[in-house]
Amino acid sequence: ITFYEGNKKEYDIYRETRKCAECMSVGLDVGVKDIAILSNGKKYENKHFKEKKKQSLIKMNRQLSRRWGPANSAFRDYNKEIREENKSNDDAEDKKNKELAKPSKGYLKIQKNHAKLERRIALQRETTYHQMTAEIVKQANFIGVETFYVKNMMKNHRLAYALGDAAMSDFISKLKYKAARSNIPLVACGMFEPTSQMCSVCGEINPKVKNLSVREWTCPRCGTHHDRDINAAKNILTLAQKTE
């Protein structure tokens, strides 16, 4: 792939092509407890970076609400009154418009520390996801994933915070570009496939597994004992290979 920057420079990027005797086809399921579960049984733990700093973030937000700044309701009400008063003074040349209130130094200091902590959390997550996705791509010659829409999943208020902390879309996007760079097919199966409920051995569907609290189950037809997430990853791989 050739890129040009004006008429001065030219960059050539060559896609990396790997030949690995030990590489395998893997299915990948994403989750909250483990961010990635592979069909070969490998699990990548979700580090919950934001959850670990939750109390610090809450404390800072509380401090911001008590300081003179945009997070304070009295500050917002005061500026609202000033705006309305200035608006009514537009046609009066003899009246001078009042300046809006500015945040206090204490507010700005806490706001800066809050932003630093948020950036640190984002950087920790990004670094970890780069390492995880690089390891997955290194051992695979085919990757199957499941189609999902985080926006719809976030409507579940019980899981919204955990889903936001997991940043599943960010993980998948990193996996996609690394797979493309290494010429590894990455195929997504359908969104509404019952991957968790279907036995990866005989294809029997167990509706009881719809309950998210069921982490392990035994197939009523063939008697195979399943880990919920690993079984889903195996089904994702099978469906993705059929979709390819």
Can you describe what each PLM-predicted range is?
Residues 1-244:
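Positively charged, helix-rich recognition surfaces that bind polyanionic ligands
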